[in-house]
Design a protein with these regions (language model features):
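Nucleic-acid endonuclease domains
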Residues: 1-69, 89-257, 263, 269, ...
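Beta-rich nucleic-acid/ligand-interaction surfaces
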Residues: 67-77
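Conserved catalytic cores of phosphodiester-cleaving nucleases, focusing on short active-site segments
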Residues: 73-75, 83-91
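Short acidic-glycine loop/turn motifs at beta-strand connectors
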Residues: 77-79, 129-130
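Conserved active-site beta-strand-loop modules that form the wall/rim of enzyme catalytic pockets
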Residues: 81-83, 120
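A generic structural signal for ordered secondary structure
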Residues: 82, 293-296, 300, 307, ...
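Extended alpha-helical coiled-coil "stalk/arm" regions
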Residues: 260-296, 302
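Short acidic DE-rich linear segments
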Residues: 319-321
Length: 321
């Protein structure tokens, strides 16, 4: 039978209950049998396991011959432009550390084969206990832009060695607490393509292609899909994916509100002291008059400090907005 990627996901999770299953990785050589307890091994095993699962369930597929690029499986062997499935796995107790693709190969591939952008990523988040028992904690089915993000100095999260761009790396798409994440994953295919285009420009190895890359891609994509994509400029969208800047802006606004509130309260205290001063001056109470005047001067200094905080917070807001 033939299934779509979504149907494969549904069968794994809902019919076979993969989230309730347990397993082990066993290895034997000669008369020695062991249970593998190295957690890093699981990620590589899962693709082979899924292939065995597809065979066991009688699901048609054709394996990919190109191990350097997605997908791993063509779920429609008669049309290798549709129902493309890539399998990834990572230790759920850590962040995803798998590679998505070599950047240079990928930016060329999506021009020559725009349908590669429709690859479904079947991602397993696994755990292994000290006895080598493997369980699957989460399963996701995602598009590439739903698992990728920007980084500090690049529009795409990349593996960079000796200033040379290598692999596209994933972001964290499952974070419930955004305070622990500096950059959010892309919201759309269009934003993802914008980041790819800017990376082509920024990367010395691909910079010479940057001037025509977008136009070439858009022509190819329309020819393949019939759709005219509208790709935003990276400079127009990059800040919305920078959660650090968002948090800095929120903090600056909070600091501004606190400093403004403090400043208003100080002004009220100064007015109160002036009323008290007037009353004591009428009574000719020299001792209290002197003390109140000292209090007024102290509050004026506090007001100046609060005003400095207001100006500093406002300047930070202007910088970030």
């Amino acid at each position: 039978m033939r299934l779509t990627a979504q149907e494969v996901y549904d069968k794994l999770v809902n019919e076979d209950g993969i989230l309730q299953l347990e397993g082990q990785i066993k290895f034997y050589l000669g008369d020695v049998n062991i249970i593998v307890k190295q957690r890093d091994v699981v990620g590589n095993i899962m693709q082979e396991w899924l292939q065995g699962w597809l065979d066991k369930r009688g699901i048609e597929y054709a394996p990919s011959e190109n191990t350097q690029m997605p997908p791993d499986f063509f779920l429609n062997p008669d049309d290798k432009t549709k129902n493309l499935l890539e399998v990834k796995a990572f230790n759920r107790n850590r962040g995803p550390g798998f590679d998505i693709a070599d950047f240079r190969m990928y930016e060329e591939e999506i021009i020559n084969k725009p349908y590669m952008l429709n690859v479904d990523y079947l991602i397993f988040g696994y755990d292994m206990n000290d006895d080598g028992v493997v369980t699957i904690k989460d399963v996701w089915l995602k598009k590439v832009w739903e698992i990728t993000r920007r980084m500090e100095d690049w529009p795409i999260n990349l593996q960079i060695k000796d200033n040379v761009v290598h692999k596209i790396r994933p972001g964290i798409w499952y974070a419930e607490d955004t305070a622990r994440t500096d950059y959010t994953v892309f919201e759309s295919l269009e934003d993802f393509i914008s980041a790819i285009e800017e990376t082509v420009f920024q990367n010395p190895k691909t910079h010479n292609n940057a001037g025509t890359w977008k136009a070439t891609f858009l022509r190819s994509y329309k020819q393949e899909t019939g759709i005219d994509l509208s790709i935003p400029r990276w400079s127009e969208i990059k800040d919305k994916y920078d959660l650090k800047s968002v948090r800095k802006l929120e903090k600056a606004k909070s600091d501004l509100a606190k400093a403004t509130d403090q400043y208003e309260k100080i002004k009220e205290r100064i007015q109160l002291y002036h009323r008290k001063l007037h009353a004591e001056q009428e009574k000719n109470n020299v001792g209290k008059v002197g003390k109140i005047q000292d209090d007024i001067e102290k509050q004026k200094r506090n007001a100046e400090k609060a005003k400095e905080k207001i100006n500093k917070a406002q300047a930070k807001i202007d910088e970030l907005e």
